[in-house]
Amino acid sequence: METWSKLLDGTTPSRRWRKLVLLLPPLLLFLLQTEALQGLESDDRFRTRENECHFYAGGQVYPGEVSRVSVADHSLHLSKAKISKPAPYWEGTAVINGEFKELKLTDYRGKYLVFFFYPLDFTFVCPTEIIAFGDRIEEFKSINTEVVACSVDSQFTHLAWINTPRRQGGLGPIRIPLLSDLNHQISKDYGVYLEDSGHTLRGLFIIDDKGVLRQITLNDLPVGRSVDETLRLVQAFQYTDKHGEVCPAGWKPGSETIIPDPAGKLKYFDKLN
């Protein structure tokens, strides 16, 4: 303020206005430069945090030589997959029992379907998930549920991975279909495709026997999913479908459920105290 007073002191009002007009451009330029620098610092912080999503335990989760593209971007497509709405339709070529077959969502009408995406064949966490679900497929079938895994790899890459022994990072004989999404359309419809990375996040979708989407789980790259939790969720949704009651936190088959009305809920909460 003192500087401004010295500059304007001893001048007539008209001269003061002329001096102000001359001083405004450099002042505005200074303010714009300051704001731009703050914006760059903010972008740098964002990029640093974004890159951290791809680094784990001292190394890249999916190195550049594997994904072939920069791992700095997490851009996702707007998902068509919405809870309580019909699941986005899909069809494509899958590897089933070592053979190429055409597969589509409507093949599973009348059954529950666990439909999950994994990033890439011949990677690290992915085979552990597929093997875990495949080894326990009979538990899913016993509750009228099927499991399908999907990635952006071709059916030929799927087959090569299946033909690779497990001790070498392969799948070996696998009991669930591996669906190919080579044009990325299915991944985009389900909102799991990372545009600049060229592969998907770990998305899992539970679709009921009427084709309605009931549950979505979406993991970042470093962490695999739980077969036990997926089974529990399917069983919980099937129970509510059949009985009309609702399942509290951590519910398992045989546990108490809640009647969803003001009087009915008291039967459940009275037993807790």
From Swiss-Prot:
Catalytic center residues: 126
Classification via CDD domains: PRX_Typ2cys (cd03015)
PROSITE patterns according to UniProt: THIOREDOXIN_2
N-terminal signal peptide: 1-40
Protein location: Cytoplasm; Endoplasmic reticulum; Secreted
Gene Ontology biological-process entries: cell redox homeostasis; extracellular matrix organization; hydrogen peroxide catabolic process; male gonad development; negative regulation of male germ cell proliferation; reactive oxygen species metabolic process; response to oxidative stress; spermatogenesis
Similarity comment text for this entry: Belongs to the peroxiredoxin family. AhpC/Prx1 subfamily.
Keyword annotations from UniProtKB, A to Z: Antioxidant, Cytoplasm, Disulfide bond, Endoplasmic reticulum, Oxidoreductase, Peroxidase, Redox-active center, Secreted, Signal
Top-level taxonomic group: Eukaryota
Gene: Prdx4
GO cellular component: cytoplasm; cytosol; endoplasmic reticulum; extracellular space; smooth endoplasmic reticulum
Natural source organism: Rattus norvegicus
The protein's name: Peroxiredoxin-4
Assembly information from the UniProt record: Homodimer; disulfide-linked, upon oxidation. 5 homodimers assemble to form a ring-like decamer.
UniProt modification remark: The enzyme can be inactivated by further oxidation of the cysteine sulfenic acid (C(P)-SOH) to sulphinic acid (C(P)-SO2H) and sulphonic acid (C(P)-SO3H) instead of its condensation to a disulfide bond.
Additional notes on this entry: The active site is a conserved redox-active cysteine residue, the peroxidatic cysteine (C(P)), which makes the nucleophilic attack on the peroxide substrate. The peroxide oxidizes the C(P)-SH to cysteine sulfenic acid (C(P)-SOH), which then reacts with another cysteine residue, the resolving cysteine (C(R)), to form a disulfide bridge. The disulfide is subsequently reduced by an appropriate electron donor to complete the catalytic cycle. In this typical 2-Cys peroxiredoxin, C(R) is provided by the other dimeric subunit to form an intersubunit disulfide.
Transmembrane segments: none
GO molecular function: identical protein binding; molecular adaptor activity; molecular sequestering activity; thioredoxin peroxidase activity
Domain Thioredoxin, chain residue ranges per copy: 81-239
Function text: Thiol-specific peroxidase that catalyzes the reduction of hydrogen peroxide and organic hydroperoxides to water and alcohols, respectively. Plays a role in cell protection against oxidative stress by detoxifying peroxides and as sensor of hydrogen peroxide-mediated signaling events. Regulates the activation of NF-kappa-B in the cytosol by a modulation of I-kappa-B-alpha phosphorylation.
